[in-house]
């Protein structure tokens, strides 16, 4: 007698996202940016302060930020006012500004012993790792947001990328500028990224009283 082929019985596993907030990560508000900067300055954490400032200015994806090299931001011994990085996702360059405060924190970080002879801007702590990983970067961001009392699950590396462009859009309404700054190839990507349609609809609704 042949035994029928029955489906294998597997133990049920809880969903990977059970109990987690996995939606779009929130941008930091200006007061959050200020609070984190002050804490890093008081702690004299030069690496993290430079990383935090450049993450906001560059608006780069985490995978591109961690791989940045010293030559990307420095020329002839001076920190550049503008820089360009080739995006790993689109293989297209994106330009960004480096503000005065960010240049100052980068220059201070460059003077650290760990940076002597380093090719990468954020060198790894161990010889086999040339630069910090995206996982390490995510952990660092989590430490930043929790240090000022924010919920870690609501923020992430994406928060760093969208913090400045969110303020730019709120103040100017210029979607094209945001598209260029983020390095998006299509405008609809930028619209979805910022949640523009929903935000605009809510703003209109809030202005109407019945």
Regions picked out by a protein language model, each given a short descriptive name:
Residues 1-210:
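Conserved catalytic core of the tyrosine transesterase superfamily
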């Amino acid at each position: 007698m042949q035994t029928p082929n029955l489906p294998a019985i597997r133990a049920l596993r809880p969903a990977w996202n059970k109990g987690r907030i996995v939606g779009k990560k929130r941008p930091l508000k200006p007061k959050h940016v200020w609070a984190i900067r002050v804490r890093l300055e008081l702690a004299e954490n030069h690496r993290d302060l430079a990383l935090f400032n450049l993450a906001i200015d560059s608006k780069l994806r985490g995978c591109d930020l961690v791989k940045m090299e010293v030559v990307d931001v420095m020329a002839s011994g001076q920190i550049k006012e503008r820089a360009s990085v080739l995006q790993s996702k689109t293989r297209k360059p994106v330009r960004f500004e480096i503000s005065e405060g960010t240049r100052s924190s980068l220059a201070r970080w460059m003077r650290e012993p760990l940076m002597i002879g380093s090719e990468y801007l954020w060198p790894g702590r161990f010889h086999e790792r040339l630069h910090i990983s995206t996982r390490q970067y995510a952990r660092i961001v989590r430490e930043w947001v929790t240090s000022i009392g924010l919920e870690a699950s609501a923020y992430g590396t994406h928060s760093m990328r969208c913090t400045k462009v969110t303020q730019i859009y709120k103040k100017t309404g210029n979607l094209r500028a945001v598209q260029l700054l983020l390095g998006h190839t299509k405008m609809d990507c930028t619209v979805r990224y910022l949640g523009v349609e929903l935000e605009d609809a809510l703003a209109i609704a809030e202005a109407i009283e019945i």
